[in-house]
Amino acid sequence: MSGFQQHTGLVVPLDAANVDTDAIIPKQFLQKVNRTGFGKHLFHDWRFLDDAGEKANPEFVMNQPRYQDASILLARENFGCGSSREHAPWALADYGIRVMIAPSFADIFYGNSINNQMVPVRLTEQEVDELFTYVHDTEGATITVDLEALSVTANGKTYHFEIDDFRRHCLLNGLDNIGLTLQHEAKIAEYEAKIPSFLK
């Protein structure tokens, strides 16, 4: 995986609190276990007016022309609540979302997002309100997120966020659980070489 240092992107404002993982990716699309192909089903029941996903809902924010190709999702509190399905961050990432900004995220969803190289940014409710106003009032509104500086810059103003050092290290260096393990490949090989043959 490639690391995340800084990203500037178009913002889509999802003005809803307590968005759960079943809304992000409904259960009927969970049959696959690889990470790709879920983006087309993201927010299926909100984006589409039919079960086949062929008739777009023009009222849903992600279908509006001004928000096409957005890579930053702005949301309200407790985003990603509900079941722990990792398909939710898979769908967001496959759709093209790199950063999510909200006052709070469900704990498991927060960790799963980082494991999939997306940056969940927690700002205060007041700061998120300011960003919603900026995005609503400004067509083509962009935000820059700098993971090195732990900053969010929008409309000439800079906000700061926190993320623990270990998770920040993983994001900066593009490390998931497998990547972290492979950092110790030499020690693993050394250990395996010492295992008696009857245990192999």
Swiss-Prot record:
GO molecular function term, any single one: 3-isopropylmalate dehydratase activity
EC class: lyase
Pathway field: Amino-acid biosynthesis; L-leucine biosynthesis; L-leucine from 3-methyl-2-oxobutanoate: step 2/4
Subunit structure: Heterodimer of LeuC and LeuD.
Keywords associated with the record: Amino-acid biosynthesis, Branched-chain amino acid biosynthesis, Leucine biosynthesis, Lyase
Reaction catalysed by this enzyme: (2R,3S)-3-isopropylmalate = (2S)-2-isopropylmalate
The enzyme's E.C. designation: 4.2.1.33
Family: Belongs to the LeuD family. LeuD type 1 subfamily.
Role this protein plays: Catalyzes the isomerization between 2-isopropylmalate and 3-isopropylmalate, via the formation of 2-isopropylmaleate.
GO biological process, one term: L-leucine biosynthetic process
Annotated protein name in UniProt: 3-isopropylmalate dehydratase small subunit
UniProt superkingdom: Bacteria
A GO term from the CC aspect: 3-isopropylmalate dehydratase complex
NCBIfam families in alphabetical order: leuD, PRK01641.1
Stretches that traverse the bilayer: none
